[in-house]
Amino acid sequence: MPLPPRMQALPARVPRRGVLLAAAALAGWGAGRPVLALPARTLVFPRDRGTHPAFRTEWWYITGHASTEADKRAFGFQLTFFRSRVDATQGMASKFAAKQLLFAHAALTDVQGKKLWHDQRIARGGFGIATASESDMDVKLRDWSLKAEGHQYIAELPSSDFGLKLGFEETQDVLLQGKQGLSRKGPKDKQASYYYSQPQLAARGSLRLKGQDFAVSGKAWLDHEWSEEILHPDAAGWDWIGMNLTDGSALTAFRLRTRDGGTLWDGGSFRSPKGGLYTFSRGEVIFKPVRYWKSPLTQTTYPVEWIVRTPADFYTVRAVIDNQELDSRQSTGAIYWEGLSELIDSNGKRVGMGYLEMTGYAQPLRM
């Protein structure tokens, strides 16, 4: 089905938060509707693995690293499904009204080839083309899908140059971010989301790259988040990491940056191998850049190596490949960096792998 004219300009891939920011402008979010603080509530599973169409924004996000058995060829992968509520059409009775928009993107980092591959899908909800179940995680967008089956998740995202066909099995309990799943994202109470993670997923399946199939296994991380508020108006961008540690621990850390490079808000969590959870308070996470990389395409400079101070340890976060940037100036205007990175502890030992996301370095994000 052809995309509506205003949607034709969406890029092949934008970061999960960037997609939602773009959709805010395209779909007319916040059209006269006040945004209220989210109440604390108990998340119920499997229901809360499904969609929450009454909320403006939602995403299901899986990142991970995997390698082949024989030659240990390494890959990073990412798959994300987004849903956005279109406020302007909620009162329309027509079944053709686009009340929900679904986006999806997939990315594959070929470490050996030092290249990032990516693709995307977009459609309005319904008509069997784009669907999301409310009873459990079951999201479909044309030929792409992500579905929960008990304690497993199955993802199939074929594309022209690459593809993902992976299964993910839970090895740990769900991790409720923030205060029992209510995660603050700014100084105001309304700047919050319902947010849980499923770290340390055992990943197994196949990756396809330029017609060649690779049987792989590794570790993955799942995030599921939904909210009404998008971004504080003073925030220019953010830095975020989600890391699976080799000992079974899980680390989340983020900060929202102001236009002068200061920290507007920060947070995250650390869960030990035995399940002990420490949720970081504001001011306990500090991102300090160590090494920079300048994009030859956009001339944007990114910190591709960081010292990230948390109550758990002082970590070094280092990009596996420097060039994991996407330039979408011809569409949403966003230029950002997101990709596979390694985690090194204060003793200089590599203790984990995961994903680093950085936005707002080329220019501040626009609402």
Spans of model-derived segments:
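N-terminal secretory signal peptides
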Residues: 1-14, 22-28
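Structured soluble/peripheral alpha/beta segments that form catalytic or ligand/cofactor-binding pockets
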Residues: 3-4, 32-367
